[in-house]
Amino acid sequence: MESKSLNTLALRCAARKIPASEFLNLYKEFYNETFPANSIDNDDAKTQEGSGSQDKTDVEESISKPVGSKNDPVAILCAEFMKLLENGKYVILADYVVEVLFVNYHSELVREFLPKLKDLMNKGILIHFFSKSCAFFVNLTDNLVISQLIKDLRATIVPCILETNFCDISNELVVAIAKFLQAVLRFTPQPIQINSETYRDNTFNLTKRLSLINKILSKKFAGIIDKKLQFKEVLGPFTKDSTLDFDNSPSITSPQFIPSPLPSMKERSVTSSQSAIKYKDLKLLRYYKNIWLNSKLMNWQPFDSEFISNYSAIKSSLYPDQVQNIQNVDLLFTDLIETAFTCFAQFVSNKLYHQSNSTYNLLERKWILFLSKILPLLVYKNSSRTAHVIGNALDGIDDKVIKAISAYYQENDDGRSRNDDLFDDYPSTSLDIRHDFIKSLTMLGVVPPVFITNYLRGDQTVDSKALATTDDLTFTNQQGIIEIVNDIPNFIRSSLEGMEMENVSEPTLVSSNGLLQVLSNFDTVSPTKQFELANAIVDMLSESSTTFELNTFVKLTAVLTFNYSHSLTSILMYVTPEVLTKLYLEFVDKHWNSQVIGKQETDGESQFENVNISMSFSWAILMLTILYKQYHIDFVSMRADYTTDNIKNSFAITFVENLPDISDLFFIDEKNSDDPEVQVKSHKLVRDWLNDLFVNGSLSDSLLQNIEPKQLAILVPYIFKQVTLAMEIGAVGDLQNLIGGFEYFLQPFMLVGLIKVMYWLEQYLSCLKSDETDEKLIQKVLSLLNTIICPSTLNEDSKAFHFAVLRLNAIPLLGILYQFRSNKHAESNYGIYSSDNEGNPTLELMISRLISSLSISPVYDIDSTILVTDNNFVQKPPKFQSFFVTNEISMNKMLTNQMNSFWSLHSSTYYNLDFLKTLIDTLTPKQFLLDVLRTLEYKVETLGVKDVRNKSSSNESDQVIDYLFYFLVLYDIENSEDAKAMAQFMEDTVDISINGDSGIVKQETQPKSEYNPDDDIDMLFGENDTSMQANEEDTLDNKELKSDRNCALGKNRHTFGFIIHEIKLSYGTLESDSMSYEDYKKICEYHSRYLKMLKTCIF
């Protein structure tokens, strides 16, 4: 070597960016040339021989032991290393030091060098040194190095670290040292005894500092200190209290296992039984809160101040005989935050591990909106707004909850590479719902920006400086300048005035308009401004619908239908669907009729006004269709001042609830369809329209002036159906004339007719495909469909509405169109390279158009792989149904899984409520109820309560039924008004009409017993699930009865409370011949139990 200086060698290597592993080879060559008498091999041998003598050396003696002289090679090298680290010119220099010290483990060098680190002034390079060392020890597997490390831990490493005064160093260095200690201490097989009080105090200060910086790391660090360090004759500051105050436990709603104190208590009688009862109470409370929160989200209930008071009253409603401690608001929010994240973890785990046969995600989106926006808003409005409230809540979240949430987000992160990271202890960049929660709180000023780093640094990396610290609503104007919105209503009005309707459906053009820009980034808007925007938009819609400001009404409705960045879903969470539903129902059924008559009596209205009149009706119907089909809003249950007669006379409700049905007869006035004059006029109107559309090739003014959009909404689908069926039987042969006539359906005033067409096509194309139809006929049908799905040109007023109509029923249509592809084996060739685009060009064009309509903004309950179009080979068959039954996942298995969940007293249902609702509707509520009751009765009677060693007492058996009935009541009832009405109904002894079978059906087969251990927390990870094996016997008779959900009078007939009441009243009638007196007594007991819960539960 030219230079005898290690410093010079290292700096030259760092300048050339030579890796640490290559530097080690150069270092060995330098060492052997510079110190030939102390070569690397000889030195290592001496180290191994002499290391054994250190085992019995006390910690303090090892530190005070003199080191070698100035001419000693070890001392020279240590001095050179200190110069390198002080230099700080290259970060890689710290990597070189770690490589020499630990990778090429040198005990004497470690003992000499580590005590000098406390004098190092360059703290940045010191942080990197500890981080790099930690990364090495985390993955260390070399037994020789581990044995040397264990000897040095006791003698050198731990004492050197604990000499540090942790009160005077930076937060970053505290975390780096803690992680280093955590990594090395895990290797020691026996606890290291510490005699020094200074070391004990410094350890306490380190843990205290860490708890203020990173709560999660602090928990883990305190745990390993408890295990690996023993402070002589001193009570360990990290020992946990063995007596837990169960009543005030911060884990009251956490799935963390709460050990029953029964085995560990010496007083066995009264005290142990009371403790066991408390444990059961906590478990039931956790279960109730889970269903309560899920039901509230499922039913779009408002989150206002009443929500907080109702939540606080849950425990007292469950246990009215217990004395309840009065919680202040901050403690209440601590519990609510912890409960909400726990419930979300259970929700995503159910979806990840139990629901592979569904694609539901609307309820998940509601959970995300609740945790990221609404919960921070509730904290901001109702709590003391102090950061320690949030800190305490996040501290209380169980580690398995965090693991479950992180695992779910990693599973759904398409961009994440799933390889094993060499340094897996390093922070990752994967974000989850906790980040969004804290970001919103930071916007509202509840917590500082550094809060997110302090609490989530353990496994996530976030730049706290980039976080928004105000709730300002901003947008970028056309000059590229960011503006702050101070007056939201004026901002909306000015944006609407400059908005071009044709740009509403173009994602690339939304940035040109302020409102579209804000809605397209709605998830980044602060909760307070989201709330203000939601209320301002609804107020403006209400005002414009009553004053007939149709330009405002049309544009606002059009913007909302596309749901950019989940904006419509968010608005529904803030104002509830009932408000919007009532608004649009009243516009269609009341305001529109009166206003249109007034407009028609006024002469001189412009073409622009005519278009707005027709388009306002069309957009209103489209919005109602979205609310009903995509958001599953039951119009009748909205209580929008509709009596039974009004419901029958409501055009909006009748239209939307019968979307796939196109009648074979058309009448101008459905109410007077028996009137001969109406029949003659209707026949003449249809004949004139057919003649103008398909013979004359143009529509006369008289036809256009004498028909209303309501009539067109029914006439257009009627004509479409009749013409298509006529072509199918060969009654019509001129395809070009038909195409020319269908093109008129794309005019703005006629587009409303396509709504029904899109739903009718689903069943028509299914029949066409299943009938082995001639290919020529299929080509003709596809050509006709191509006219309305992929038009060559569109009016600027038609463009956005046409795109929105395509989105309505695109998923089922895509599923059927895929079946028409010529590549019939594409789905079976899964994993084999094969192009999807082998079908008819017209067919592929329609498929592409439908996919593009879905891709511009969120659509719910669909398989996301449908929207992936850049793959050149089939990876996996897409799912076109949101719920499906397979041979592996049968109805019997699903029902049994849920029944076993009730029996096992899990803290959440096995399936999420959206999945369960479909399961219950498919089986019918009555069949579900009877099957579950029969099976639980059998299990409790013969097997007792799961995981209870002895045969259960009556109280324990009752708890299983209680779990079921709390679910039934919360599933049925949305609010206290419904509960009062149902209670009054069930207390009435007047007979009711009986529909369908009633009575308890005798069980012919006994369900197979299950003894798999299934702790409550295992539900989070799909472990020890209650699934039946493939060879288990069926426990139900598969029946699929049609549910009369659309009938106002029949709605309550499908609640569990109604069914129980119906069965009770049916005793003694002809329909109940199979019901014994014992069965009747049982149903009376269940009736009383349900009624009692109705009166005591919080809704």
UniProtKB/Swiss-Prot annotation:
Domain of life: Eukaryota
UniProt-listed GO biological process terms: positive regulation of transcription elongation by RNA polymerase II; positive regulation of transcription initiation by RNA polymerase II; RNA polymerase II preinitiation complex assembly
Pfam families per the UniProt record, alphabetical: Med5
Subcellular localization, as worded in the UniProt entry: Nucleus
Keywords: Activator, Nucleus, Transcription, Transcription regulation
GO cellular component: core mediator complex; mediator complex
GO molecular-function term, one example from the UniProt record: transcription coregulator activity
Annotated segments matching region Disordered: 41-66
Residue stretches in coiled coil: none
Function (record text): Component of the Mediator complex, a coactivator involved in the regulated transcription of nearly all RNA polymerase II-dependent genes. Mediator functions as a bridge to convey information from gene-specific regulatory proteins to the basal RNA polymerase II transcription machinery. Mediator is recruited to promoters by direct interactions with regulatory proteins and serves as a scaffold for the assembly of a functional preinitiation complex with RNA polymerase II and the general transcription factors.
Family affiliation: Belongs to the Mediator complex subunit 5 family.
Record text on subunit structure and interactions: Component of the Mediator complex.
Name of the protein: Mediator of RNA polymerase II transcription subunit 5
Natural source organism: Candida glabrata (strain ATCC 2001 / BCRC 20586 / JCM 3761 / NBRC 0622 / NRRL Y-65 / CBS 138)
Gene that specifies this protein: NUT1
